[in-house]
């Protein structure tokens, strides 16, 4: 045997040994983790984190929202949930099942009873009375596309007909975003999905519990120290992650056989000043002093209603540093007061995009929504940003459409629902081959059916007033104007309790199975008739066995 043939026989042995070592290094820890995971499950340590768990609704089988689903995405004590929902296991023939995906704006915050999905539901019921529609809103506070995707994945088996995606506001501040306080931030898609999987296991839950302290949810003020400039390289990864998640969510939805509507996100431009601003990095001390003097003089002129003169000084300041979000907002406001609405809108949008507390979907997020929707067959686009802008005489979304930064008013929710309704009506017409009357119920008709009373308008305005008394809203340059607008609505015109009750009773008579109507009526009645309130709240029970309480904590079911 020659040397060359001997080397060929001997050489594979070290390679096999290395392969064995590598395989052992991988498989043994995995096996140990598997044993630990199985042991924890057998010992009932931890909780399931699937989106849906079995339940019954009035004795009929259903899948209900799992209150532990969001735990992998939030620190202990800060878990946020959607408006609770249950999906019937038996889908009746002819039923059209719609799932709404998104964050708090999609959910309908500040009150899901009057979110766009509720308007959509009554529109469909009124115009297509012979069909049954199920509109399930899965939107939730503080989540983003990293959470929306697993929600869609687990809803895909529930025989959906349509997914409506209204998402993009929380890509920076939500889980795994560069400005978040909820999880590790700014990770790649593989790292994010691995983290979600590990945190969902019983082993991951135990390690997370041991390694973290329980925290209290404090809303938007928790993020004050998490400013992310538009120029940050982290934004590039944020946009890439959002697009990847959006495409994957659409793919999951389409694979289920459902149609998909993607909506752009409407944000308040005109009446929501930036939450925080930052100067460009390379600004010299001399340039900063010059900028501050121009800014100071411009503010004095603006306060004196000398908008043209103020605009000149603001423009000079922007030539020194054009990255300061508040300056862009002042330029926009001056242009608006000079009736140059087109230019004003551009600067309002840039002020939003430069805001370093990134609670609003920026121009790039909406560009991704448009691009992705138009690039995939059978996906429809509802350009809410454009549609709601066009509803304003000046073409700029303000507080009549969006309460504060992103949450839609009744008018905003109605306009968004109307566009989604028209898409669905067109689809139903094409499927049946018939001419279907797609006239949209008026906003007033919808609000009668939803029992949006003067009492509720005032109640919601008071809730928004309370929110705006905390940072970061108190840091906005137009904070006092925002408070005045909401205070005026909160005072409102007087409505007697009897009138309010009659409006609820009329709506419930039209839709006796509407749990949301019963819930809101019960909450209203609590101040007048505890027994009647308990009865109504009991009828709003999301599924059998779920505890129902009065506002004072008394359990009624």
Task: Place the predicted regions along the sequence by residue.
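TPR alpha-solenoid repeat register
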Residues: 327, 517, 549-551
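Membrane/wall-proximal cationic-aromatic binding patches
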Residues: 43-128, 391
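Hydrophobic membrane-insertion alpha-helices, especially the h-region
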Residues: 23-38
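Accessory beta->alpha helical hairpin/"wing" motif in late/C-terminal subdomains of nucleic-acid enzymes
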Residues: 408-411
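Short, well-structured alpha-helical segments in soluble
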Residues: 148-162
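Short coil turns that delineate tetratricopeptide repeat
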Residues: 160, 322-323, 356, 512-513, ...
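Serine-dependent acyl-ester chemistry module
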Residues: 3-10, 168-371, 384-399, 422, ...
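Structural motif
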Residues: 135, 141-152
């Amino acid at each position: 045997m020659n040397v060359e043939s001997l080397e060929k026989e001997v050489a594979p042995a070290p390679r096999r040994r290395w392969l064995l070592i590598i395989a052992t290094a991988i498989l043994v820890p995995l096996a140990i983790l598997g044993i630990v995971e199985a042991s924890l499950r057998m010992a009932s340590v931890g909780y399931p984190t699937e989106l849906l768990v079995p339940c019954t609704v009035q004795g009929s089988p259903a899948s209900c929202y799992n209150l532990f689903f969001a735990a992998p995405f939030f620190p202990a004590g800060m878990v946020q949930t959607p408006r609770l929902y249950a999906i019937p296991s038996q889908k009746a023939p002819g039923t059209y099942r719609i799932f709404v995906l998104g964050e708090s704006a999609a959910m309908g915050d500040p009150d899901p009873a009057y979110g766009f999905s509720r308007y959509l539901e009554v529109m469909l019921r009124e115009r297509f009375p012979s069909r049954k529609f199920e509109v399930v809103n899965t939107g939730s506070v503080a989540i983003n596309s990293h959470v929306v995707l697993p929600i869609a994945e687990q809803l895909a088996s529930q025989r959906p007909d349509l997914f409506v995606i209204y998402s993009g506001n929380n890509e920076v501040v939500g889980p795994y975003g560069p400005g978040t306080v909820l999880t590790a931030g700014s990770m790649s898609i593989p790292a994010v999905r691995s983290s979600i999987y590990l945190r969902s296991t019983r082993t991951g839950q135990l390690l997370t519990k041991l390694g973290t302290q329980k925290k209290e949810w404090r809303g938007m003020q928790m993020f004050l120290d998490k400013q992310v400039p538009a120029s940050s390289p982290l934004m590039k990864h944020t946009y890439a992650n959002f697009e990847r998640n959006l495409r994957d969510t659409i793919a999951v939805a389409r694979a289920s056989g459902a149609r998909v509507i993607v909506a752009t996100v409407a944000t308040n431009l005109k009446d929501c000043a930036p939450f925080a601003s930052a100067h460009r990095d390379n600004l010299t001390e001399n340039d900063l002093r010059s900028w501050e003097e121009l800014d100071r003089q411009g503010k004095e002129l603006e306060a004196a209603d000398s908008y043209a003169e103020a605009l000149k000084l603001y423009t000079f300041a922007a030539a020194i540093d054009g990255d300061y979000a508040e300056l862009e907002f002042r330029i926009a406001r001056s242009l608006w007061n000079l009736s140059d609405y087109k230019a004003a809108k551009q600067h309002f949008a840039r002020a939003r995009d430069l805001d370093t507390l990134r609670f609003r979907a920026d121009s790039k997020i909406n560009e991704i929504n448009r691009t992705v929707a138009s690039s995939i067959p059978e996906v429809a686009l509802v350009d809410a940003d454009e549609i709601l802008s066009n509803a304003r005489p000046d073409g700029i979304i303000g507080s009549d459409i969006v309460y504060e930064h992103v949450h839609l008013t009744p008018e905003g929710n109605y306009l968004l629902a109307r566009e989604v309704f028209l898409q669905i009506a067109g689809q139903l017409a094409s499927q049946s081959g018939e001419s279907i009357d797609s006239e949209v119920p008026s906003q007033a008709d919808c609000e009668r059916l939803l029992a949006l009373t003067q009492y509720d308008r005032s109640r919601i305005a008071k809730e928004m007033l309370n929110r705006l008394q905390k940072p970061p809203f108190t840091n906005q340059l137009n904070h006092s104007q925002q408070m005045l607008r909401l205070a005026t609505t909160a005072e409102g015109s007087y409505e007697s309790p009897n009138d309010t009750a009659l409006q609820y009773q009329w709506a419930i008579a039209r839709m006796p199975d509407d749990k949301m109507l019963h819930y809101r009526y019960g909450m209203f009645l609590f101040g007048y008739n505890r027994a009647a309130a308990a009865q109504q709240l009991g009828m709003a029970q999301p599924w059998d066995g779920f505890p129902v309480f009065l506002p004072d904590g008394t359990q009624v079911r």
